[in-house]
């Protein structure tokens, strides 16, 4: 016989309900913790995939009250020193009417196109400064028509590598041979220099180069004869450069009488006019020989550096040349007047009986002789002034 089932009391029912509720609460709590843990893991993965890796660039230092940064960097009014080197006539080529086994082109072929051959002896000097400037005299072109004149010089466009291989950064084209092959040759020369990173300038083309944060203006002028018109073009360019914010203005002039060791009155008049107009330095070439120098209003005028890497003559009678170097101190728009200059004696050739087209620094007795020669020329200028 089966026992009769009994009915649960209210107390038992209440206990069962409490137990069920507690179990449900525990389950929800465990589920919430698991979900939170999963959410954190997902957030870390997303952050790792979207946040870029830190760079080595430090945060910019905060500016201090004195116009300086907290790191100690000065404002632009701090003095900046820069060294600029100048060399003379670079005729990288030959007149086709005088081509022979001793010509510049023949030397290029003998060196199998090694552009470093020509300026090898001065490359270290040029590489140690902040800017090197030469006179590029002749056309670098395969085209154009030869001018009807006694000497017209042309070289291959690739000859521009001769300059760039020795840290020559700029070249004036204001001279009597840059247009020996017309406008085509002139334009090709500019393009050839541009391709090698050599800044050309001259006539109405004023070049502006940034050297250690200093805006330098390079002005090239050609004086086929002493004239007020040439002087005005030069001084107008100087004024324009100043208006453009140039801090240092350099003028490279092609002037004077060929093969004359003494300057003309016109050279001095024009050179001093350039200084009066605001130039900080005037250097010159064209006579094919070195001339003297003077200081006017605290600025240097170096009248002729002579030839340099000169393909215009297989054996020049006078192989002496000069490299001029000046270190400028620029503070804002002010250029200090100083005598931090160097007149470096050199020769256009490593041989005395022929032109090797490889300028070399003079040493020993040769250096002393050239130094004395330049000083004597400077003394004559001073005596006549």
Model-derived segments and spans:
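Acidic, metal/ion-coordinating pockets
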Residues: 2-385
């Amino acid at each position: 016989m089966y026992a009769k089932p009994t009915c649960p009391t209210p107390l038992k029912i209440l206990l069962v309900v409490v137990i069920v509720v507690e179990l449900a609460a525990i389950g929800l709590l465990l589920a919430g913790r698991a979900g939170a843990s999963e959410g954190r893991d997902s957030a870390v993965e997303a952050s790792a995939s979207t946040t870029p890796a830190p760079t080595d660039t430090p945060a910019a230092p905060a500016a201090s009250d004195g116009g300086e940064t907290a790191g100690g960097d000065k404002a632009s009014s701090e003095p900046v020193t820069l060294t600029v080197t100048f060399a003379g006539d670079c005729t990288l080529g030959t007149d086709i009417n005088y081509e022979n086994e001793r010509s510049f082109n023949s030397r290029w072929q003998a060196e199998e196109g090694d552009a470093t051959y020509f300026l090898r002896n001065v490359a270290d000097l040029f590489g140690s400064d902040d800017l090197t400037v030469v006179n590029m005299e002749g056309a670098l072109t395969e085209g154009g028509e030869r001018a009807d004149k006694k000497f017209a010089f042309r070289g291959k466009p690739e000859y521009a590598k001769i300059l760039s291989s020795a840290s020559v950064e700029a070249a004036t084209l204001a001279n009597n041979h840059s247009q020996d092959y017309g406008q085509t040759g002139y334009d090709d020369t500019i393009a050839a220099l541009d391709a090698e990173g050599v800044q050309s300038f001259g006539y109405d083309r004023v070049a502006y180069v940034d050297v250690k944060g200093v805006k330098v203006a390079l002005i090239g002028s050609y004086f086929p004869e002493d004239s007020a018109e040439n002087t005005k073009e030069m001084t107008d360019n100087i004024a324009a450069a100043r208006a453009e914010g140039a801090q240092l203005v350099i003028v490279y002039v092609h002037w004077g009488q060929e093969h004359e060791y003494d300057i003309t009155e016109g050279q001095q008049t024009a050179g001093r006019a350039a200084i009066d107009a605001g130039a900080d330095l005037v250097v010159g070439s064209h006579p094919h020989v070195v001339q003297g120098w003077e200081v006017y209003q605290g600025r240097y005028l170096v009248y002729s550096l002579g030839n340099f890497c000169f393909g215009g003559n297989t054996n020049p009678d006078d192989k002496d040349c000069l490299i001029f170097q000046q270190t400028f101190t620029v503070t804002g728009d002010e250029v200090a007047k100083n005598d931090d200059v160097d007149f470096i004696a050199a020769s256009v050739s490593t041989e005395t009986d022929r032109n090797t087209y490889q300028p070399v620094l003079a040493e020993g007795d040769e250096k002393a002789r050239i130094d004395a020669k330049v000083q004597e020329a400077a003394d004559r200028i001073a005596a006549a002034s």
